[in-house]
């Protein structure tokens, strides 16, 4: 143990370890449903506690965002996590620019955060989306950057948020594949992106029962011992 205060540490890695230790302890030992749900969200909307997720304060903000939406809507969380500073660094979207696209976040957004990857039925076609859809989603997410000083506050969560760099956004129409009914998102729409309208357009299957069932199975497997303890106490 240490008597030093975290704000006296120069090592960001040490700060992150302290924050994650505190959070893990609560997630694993507190019997409240909210802690369990927050831990469950972390298994899907994951960032590393180590280097590659920004400062310790960004990591703390990320954990607070999961806590805020523990009882909330997973579709709304998927929108908010897009502007999460830690996530922007961890999945490289802060490096996603119109002239140099980075598809890492777009791929995870579709495969893990929203509609899930289905059976591969053709080259680059995963039933629920295709490689073309990843490319178009990356264009939608281009220009969303980390705000290092945490000065932008989200009005819904009251937590620090990333920013929009208009000059780095791909300012062309985005046309998706047959998996999205060949939908085209026309420009200009960037002024409404922060409200999640454009992001919503690539979440058409987020309420698919397969996603709900898959997530419930994951949650039950992670916490089945907790359910037993709760049942024994009723």
Task: Label each PLM-derived region with a short phrase.
Residues 3-15, 24-28, 52:
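Post-signal peptide N-terminal segment of secreted/secretory-pathway proteins
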């Amino acid at each position: 143990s240490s008597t030093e205060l975290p704000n006296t540490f120069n090592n960001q890695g040490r700060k992150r370890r302290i924050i994650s230790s505190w959070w893990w302890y609560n997630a694993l030992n507190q019997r409240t449903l909210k802690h369990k749900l927050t831990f469950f969200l972390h298994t899907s909307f994951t960032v590393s506690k180590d280097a590659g997720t920004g400062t310790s304060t960004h990591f703390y903000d990320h954990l607070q965002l999961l806590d805020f939406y523990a009882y909330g809507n997973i579709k709304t969380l998927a929108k908010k996590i897009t502007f999460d500073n830690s996530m922007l660094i961890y999945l490289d979207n802060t490096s996603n620019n119109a002239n140099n696209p980075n598809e890492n976040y777009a791929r995870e957004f579709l495969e893990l955060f929203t509609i899930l990857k289905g059976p591969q039925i053709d080259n680059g076609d995963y039933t629920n989306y295709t490689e073309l859809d990843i490319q178009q989603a990356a264009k939608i997410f281009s220009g969303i950057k980390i705000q290092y000083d945490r000065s932008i506050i989200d009005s819904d969560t009251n937590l620090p948020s990333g920013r929009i760099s208009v000059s780095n956004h791909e300012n062309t129409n985005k046309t998706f594949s047959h998996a999205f009914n060949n939908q085209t998102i026309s420009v200009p729409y960037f002024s409404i992106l922060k409200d999640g309208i454009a992001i919503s357009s690539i979440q058409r299957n987020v309420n698919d029962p397969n996603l709900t069932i898959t997530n419930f199975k994951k949650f039950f497997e992670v916490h089945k011992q907790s359910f037993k303890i709760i049942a024994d106490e009723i």
